[in-house]
Amino acid sequence: MTDIAGQQRRPAYTVNVAAAAAALGLLAFAADSVDGVAGHVMVALTSSGFAWGLAAVLAGRHADTMRRAVTGATGVLVLATVLYYLLILLVSRRWSGATLADGSSANMAGLRSVAVMTAVWLAGSLLAGPLLGLLGYAVRANTTRRAALAAGIACGLLSAEGWHAIVQAPPWRLLALGDPFFYGVAFGEIVRVVLPLAALGWLVAAHRLGRAWPMLLASTAAAATAGTLLWYALGLVQGA
């Protein structure tokens, strides 16, 4: 069995889930207003699939029951999504102020866009939250081999957004453009891959999973590949 020292009980667990959701939503909203290289780094750290997915995995890891792992991880993502889009709707109001080709207001189109994206990410939260929560719980509460499988799947999925970005726009090509803006894009892509691998290393050390390294490598590679395809499909939905 792996280390079980990380579990939390109510009410501390509920408070921590709510605090994590608030932090995710606020930081993601703040990252949108940062320009340049710093902006790309902020987005990679606070408003990426890695950042939000890791929060869900950790919510599952610290739960004391499987059911709470599911509800906690899903709650983090749902609450953060709602807060983020509420801030866009009420504070930044970046959906408003534009005009159509005929000179009329584009506010309704902007509101529809916010509504659609809110629905898409809420659906994603409801699908990804339970899975990531269960993976986090399995890392802590299962045998070494099964914990290694869960850790590899989790971190492979967390790195998928970065791999998808690298496939779409390889960082070496971006760096060759010699533009500081694209330097930031390239750095953000790399961060989205390096940090999930660092998280995997931490889980391996914390739960002594090194003996199951073949399982770790295979599950990480398979999950990263599957996750990259899912991000590609999501891009098609967003562009439709």
Where do the model's predicted regions map?
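N-terminal topogenic module of multi-pass integral membrane proteins
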Residues: 1-94, 103-107, 111
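Central hydrophobic cores of alpha-helical transmembrane segments
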Residues: 71-80, 150-157, 213-226
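Alpha-helical transmembrane segments of multipass membrane proteins
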Residues: 24, 28, 79-84, 128, ...
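Membrane-proximal helix-loop-helix units in multi-pass membrane proteins
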Residues: 86-175
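Juxtamembrane boundary at the C-terminal end of a transmembrane helix
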Residues: 228-240
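Hydrophobic secondary-structure block in the mid-to-C-terminal portion of proteins
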Residues: 160-225
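Alpha-helical transmembrane segments of polytopic membrane proteins
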Residues: 41-53, 109-127, 181-196
